[in-house]
Amino acid sequence: MRPSQRQANELRPVRLTRRYTRHAEGSVLVEFGDTRVLCTASVEEAVPPFLKGKGRGWVTAEYGMLPRATHTRSAREAAKGKQTGRTQEIQRLIGRSLRAVVDLAALGERQVVIDCDVLQADGGTRTASITGAYVALHDALEGLVAAGKLAANPMTDFVAAISVGIVDGVPVLDLDYTEDSGCDTDMNVVMTGSGGIIEVQGTAEGTPFSRTELNALIDLAEAGIGRLVELQKAALAGA
């Protein structure tokens, strides 16, 4: 049995709370167990310079952690004057994942900026960010449809992400911090609602993993992401 008393293929309790803030066009508080991330989507009626005049839009993301999101306080990156490599990697991953399910030509010459701010971290912050950011982006784009600025929502599919890993020789789903810090293999998987793979990030922390174990982890992630997509659909079906 895992430290959280979950089965190997069991997600932590997941909650998606829409319209969590007042000002952003889309906002979601996403909770994966004790990991909590505030995701907002802000619409800008302009595009980056490299897209000007090309008739296409853009979706980008920024990611950060509150100083006391972790067990001990971390200095704000703004105070240090630069972002860490980890932060840059995660925000690029979030942006890539969302752009994979948006028809950027249909979006028109506008940009949506996703902000993912980790309020409390207990493992899986990047996967929670992607899963919550999808819902925030969906709401922001629906707002453009309601305002008559878009004929239809340009999102082409759902997208969600989950962590998997090998802990004490057993493939497990949705690692918390305790498992993540002591696992043999750590992997993050991003997939669409229709089963397309967007990204797989996998590392052997100690003993190399086999192709059979890799396949088992992907299968575990695919099933978990399927459940997350159902939760996204349920959240979006709410008033």
UniProtKB/Swiss-Prot annotation:
Gene Ontology terms, MF aspect: 3'-5'-RNA exonuclease activity; tRNA binding; tRNA nucleotidyltransferase activity
Q: Which residues bind phosphate?
A: 86, 124-126
Which Pfam families does the record cross-reference, listed alphabetically? RNase_PH (PF01138), RNase_PH_C (PF03725)
Lineage: superkingdom: Bacteria
Keywords for this entry?
Answer: Nucleotidyltransferase, RNA-binding, rRNA processing, Transferase, tRNA processing, tRNA-binding
Question: What Enzyme Commission number(s) apply to this enzyme?
Answer: 2.7.7.56
One example of a Gene Ontology biological process annotation: tRNA processing
Q: Which reaction does it catalyse?
A: tRNA(n+1) + phosphate = tRNA(n) + a ribonucleoside 5'-diphosphate
Family the UniProt entry places it in:
Belongs to the RNase PH family.
Assembly notes? Homohexameric ring arranged as a trimer of dimers.
- Outline what the protein does: Phosphorolytic 3'-5' exoribonuclease that plays an important role in tRNA 3'-end maturation. Removes nucleotide residues following the 3'-CCA terminus of tRNAs; can also add nucleotides to the ends of RNA molecules by using nucleoside diphosphates as substrates, but this may not be physiologically important. Probably plays a role in initiation of 16S rRNA degradation (leading to ribosome degradation) during starvation.
Recorded protein name is Ribonuclease PH
What's the gene? rph
